[in-house]
Amino acid sequence: MAKEATRIRRRERKNIVSGVAHVNASFNNTMITITDAQGNTISWSSAGAMGFKGSRKSTPYAAQVAAEDAGRKAAEHGMRTLEVEVSGPGSGRESALRALQAAGFTVTSIRDVTPIPHNGCRPRKRRRV
């Protein structure tokens, strides 16, 4: 039995002009997902996916590189305007936003959607360094 030649599926070019950039900046990593208005993912990137490991993933520079990568992929699909939703306490929040603006996107709105508990679960214990 001969193996069938695996067909490489070419990613079709969607023509989406505006979308939403979700920036999730945790203490350990920064993830950027660019979606259309319905929430379907167009492109994504993270500091870890860009080759940063360990504590370097949480740096603002790593977030900037990841945002540039996600923006470049989204621009290939014709995206030009973005709404930005920033979530999390990490250090890559502002640098990812600046990188998206520098990549040529028109940022129409910036929203902070960090979940804040109204005295919900007990937080983890304090670090003593």
Curated annotation (Swiss-Prot):
InterPro entries: Ribosomal_uS11, Ribosomal_uS11_bac-type, Ribosomal_uS11_CS, Ribosomal_uS11_sf. One of its GO terms (molecular function) is rRNA binding. Coiled coil: none annotated. Gene3D superfamilies: Ribosomal protein S11. Keywords: Ribonucleoprotein, Ribosomal protein, RNA-binding, rRNA-binding. The keyword Ribonucleoprotein applies. The keyword rRNA-binding applies. It holds the Pfam family Ribosomal_S11. GO terms for cellular component: ribonucleoprotein complex; ribosome. GO terms for biological process: translation. Part of the 30S ribosomal subunit. Interacts with proteins S7 and S18. Binds to IF-3. Belongs to the universal ribosomal protein uS11 family. Located on the platform of the 30S subunit, it bridges several disparate RNA helices of the 16S rRNA. Forms part of the Shine-Dalgarno cleft in the 70S ribosome. This is Small ribosomal subunit protein uS11. It comes from Methylobacterium sp. (strain 4-46). The gene is rpsK.
